[in-house]
Amino acid sequence: METKAQFLEELKKYNENYDLEVIGAAFDMAYKLHEGQLRKSGEPYFIHPIAVSKILAQLGMDEATIVGGLLHDVVEDTEYTREMLVKDFGEEVDVLVDGVTKLGSIKFDTKEEAQAENLRKMFFAMSKDIRVLIIKLADRL
């Protein structure tokens, strides 16, 4: 698995002005919170938020979006709360993480209902902050 130093070095290729201390803190938090979790493939879950945040960096997204990519599943999948997220990483990151969580949270009876609601949620997310949708799309790649 990739080390924090390797990850941060790769991010610098995309934007040398990223605050690597903040991104590094998000890396550490995501690693700690997802420790022991596995993907269906059996790989450590933590490789997923790393991949999401790398996609976001390749797209030229800002630092808050990179941090949101690293932390996009922590409130939904761990004991970490939105209040903790705000305290540790600020309101902007919380809004992004909460938006990504809400985009994937409703289940439907039919495929058509699900598709219509997903479109509605995507358009709503775009109207609030397009970065929410970009994180969600990177999450699906």
Map each language-model feature to its residues.
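Active-site helical microenvironments for divalent-metal-assisted chemistry
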Residues: 1-141
